[in-house]
Amino acid sequence: MEKRKDSLRIIAQALSSYRAEEMFISFNGGKDCTVLLDLIHQANLKDAKKIKCIYVRPLNPFSEIEEFVDRCRQHYGITIATVDGGIKAALEQICRADPQLKACIMGSRRSDPYCERLASFQETDPGWPRLMRINPLLEWTCEDIWSYIREHNVPYCALYDRGYTSIGDRTNTIPNPHLKVEADSSGEEVTYLPAYTLQDADKYERAGRL
């Protein structure tokens, strides 16, 4: 997969520009940053596995996400630190706790909000903690993400099998209505297809966000 090679080149470039101790992976338990974590840990790159991983926990997290973060700790044999709060406040806290940090590796994709013009290497905006944002997955589509997950048996949160396609927290996320299986006259409970079955996914991925 050419996009995978491009992503690994970006990660390699990051490791040539910064020491592993100067970078961290921003992790939220979602599919995109899980693919990012897997790429970094499967890559045969010097010091790649030394890059710290930080779980930015929202105010009202799904228990399934919490469980999945623990599963990733075990699956990859890594320490995942936890920082609570919104992303800006979390980054401020992270940088105060470890002033040597200079770069944040993220799972952002071009179809994500405010990412249309994002570059693979781009500094944070004014008013934010000063970091280089590194975006190895920028050109991946939602279909690319799911193809990689299924081809490489990458673990993912159970919510995705229940129709959730873009996961925030319990106050702003519902199953994607485009995956709803209508109940028949028997009165059976409404169900949802898995996230990886969503058609035109880059367009409808966030339809379950409130």
Residue locations for each model-derived region?
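Nucleotide-activated chemistry modules centered on ATP-dependent adenylation/adenylyltransferase
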Residues: M1-L210
